[in-house]
């Protein structure tokens, strides 16, 4: 007998805790709210000016007319800033008890003890816990919450902040620029290579909450770093908004891998701008796992500015009932002999919709550049849908571009073969899906791969019958 499809209340991360915040802004977006955020953070005047200019841009810019339906997103019904505690603690014992219980349930302290070089935990609008191995500090590595970096490393911060994603980039980048709070700031000095990942974990707890972290990563010449972020939120009947901005600078011969495993509840709008500048022989890797949310619109972007620069995006998107995953990648070739790879894996079930939306651009100076794109979609029933929307711009005739797209269903032959060996239809379907996503999970650190497989199995419950 087939299992009953899980109710939203079965969502593992769907619990929410009592409100323990020490400050909560009024709902709605106004100039006073923006000034209040900046004042509470004791920011320099230039940052307040940046926020106010961004707010004006947000008001002027139109909503996206493509992608998913944003008509129910009410900016006046969102709380833009919630301060959960007085400061980010470096000792787990000093984190407020209610917040600590939340992260204990999510396994954050255990994960840190096992295999992380540093960890940051953000709850609502602020980082509540941050720690990094002392030996990394001694090497000159900076890993701190973005607000602290503004106060303590202002010159370095100001040099790179909003240089990759300006406020005018799009409406949601403007919104983030006006009300940003929290996020991670990482600087890795020349020729320093980190062998273990740095991690940040983002948790929305309140109803009608907006989370607007700002992450900035700088890998100096010859440096290497792997950053992992995880995201969850409780299940509510009303919507929350997650609108982050990620800026990464990969200098000459440097390497950055940015891994995301998001598992938002299905009442969250996830509208994120991620972009990196990659210089000579630098290498940027986006590894992007998208589960949950009401609507995700996210297209990690590599701007390849130096000769020999490389960019890649490996992504998985899973859309279930009432969910739209509008995701993809952008590769902008601006220099000779640059290369990019996009591998997109999408799964839809129970009427979910997955969309691959990608742009590959070859500029006039991109002689010898090449790009390879693979889009594979697995549809698990007749109610679910998939679209592939590639857009290629070519301004140099000495480039190479390959694009392969495939949409398939679980085949009767595969099911028959597995079921003839005593495996149930549900287990057989699950095995086929696991094989489909294996190119993604094999790129994750072992602990994350185990968690991703477990999340997919949870999403698969009730797919048969």
UniProtKB/Swiss-Prot annotation:
InterPro entries: Fe-S_cluster_assembly_SufBD (IPR055346), SUF_FeS_clus_asmbl_SufB (IPR010231), SUF_FeS_clus_asmbl_SufBD_core (IPR000825), SUF_FeS_clus_asmbl_SufBD_sf (IPR037284), SufBD_N (IPR045595). It holds the Pfam family SufBD_N. GO terms for biological process: iron-sulfur cluster assembly. NCBIfam families: sufB (TIGR01980). Belongs to the iron-sulfur cluster assembly SufBD family. This is Iron-sulfur cluster assembly SufBD family protein SAOUHSC_00851. It comes from Staphylococcus aureus (strain NCTC 8325 / PS 47).
């Amino acid at each position: 007998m087939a299992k009953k499809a899980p109710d939203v209340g079965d969502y593992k991360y769907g619990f929410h805790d009592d409100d323990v915040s020490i400050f909560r802004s009024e709902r709605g977006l106004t100039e006073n709210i923006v000034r209040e955020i900046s004042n509470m953070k004791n920011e320099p005047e230039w940052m307040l000016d940046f926020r106010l200019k961004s707010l004006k841009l947000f008001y002027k810019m139109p909503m996206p007319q493509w992608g998913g339906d944003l008509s129910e997103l009410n900016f006046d019904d969102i709380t833009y800033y919630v301060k959960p505690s007085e400061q980010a603690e470096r000792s787990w014992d000093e984190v407020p008890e209610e917040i600590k219980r939340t992260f204990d349930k999510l396994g954050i302290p255990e994960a840190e003890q096992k295999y992380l070089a540093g960890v940051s935990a953000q709850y609502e609008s602020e980082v509540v816990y941050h720690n990094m191995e002392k030996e990394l500090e001694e090497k000159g590595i900076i890993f701190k919450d973005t607000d602290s970096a503004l106060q303590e490393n202002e010159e370095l911060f100001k040099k790179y902040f909003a240089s990759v994603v300006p406020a005018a980039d799009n409406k949601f980048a403007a919104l983030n620029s006006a009300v940003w709070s929290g996020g991670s700031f990482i600087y890795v000095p020349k020729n320093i290579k980190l062998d273990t990942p740095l991690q940040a974990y983002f948790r929305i707890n309140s109803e009608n909450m907006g989370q607007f972290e700002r992450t900035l990563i700088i890998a100096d010449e010859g440096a290497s770093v792997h950053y992992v972020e995880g995201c969850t939120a409780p299940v509510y009947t009303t919507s929350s908004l997650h609108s982050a901005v990620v800026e990464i600078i990969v200098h000459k011969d440097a390497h950055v891998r940015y891994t995301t495993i998001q598992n938002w509840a299905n009442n969250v709008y996830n509208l994120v701008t991620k972009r990196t500048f990659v210089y000579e022989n630098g290498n940027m890797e986006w590894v992007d796992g998208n589960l949950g949310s009401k609507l995700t619109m996210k297209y990690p972007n590599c701007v390849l500015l130096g000769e020999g620069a490389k960019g890649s995006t490996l992504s998985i998107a899973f859309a279930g009932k009432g969910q739209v995953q509008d995701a993809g990648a952008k590769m902008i070739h601006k220099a000779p002999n640059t290369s990019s790879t996009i591998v997109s894996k999408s799964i839809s079930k129970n009427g979910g919709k997955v969309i691959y939306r990608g742009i590959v651009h070859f500029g006039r100076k991109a002689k010898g550049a090449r790009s390879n794109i693979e889009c594979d979609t697995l549809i698990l029933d007749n109610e679910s849908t998939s679209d592939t929307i590639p857009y290629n711009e070519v301004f140099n005739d000495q480039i190479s571009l390959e694009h392969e797209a495939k949409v398939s269903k679980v085949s009767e032959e595969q099911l028959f073969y597995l079921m003839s060996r005593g495996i149930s239809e549900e287990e057989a379907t699950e095995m086929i899906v696991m094989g489909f996503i294996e190119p993604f999970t094999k790129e994750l650190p072992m602990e994350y791969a185990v968690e991703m497989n477990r999340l997919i199995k949870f999403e698969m419950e009730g797919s048969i019958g």
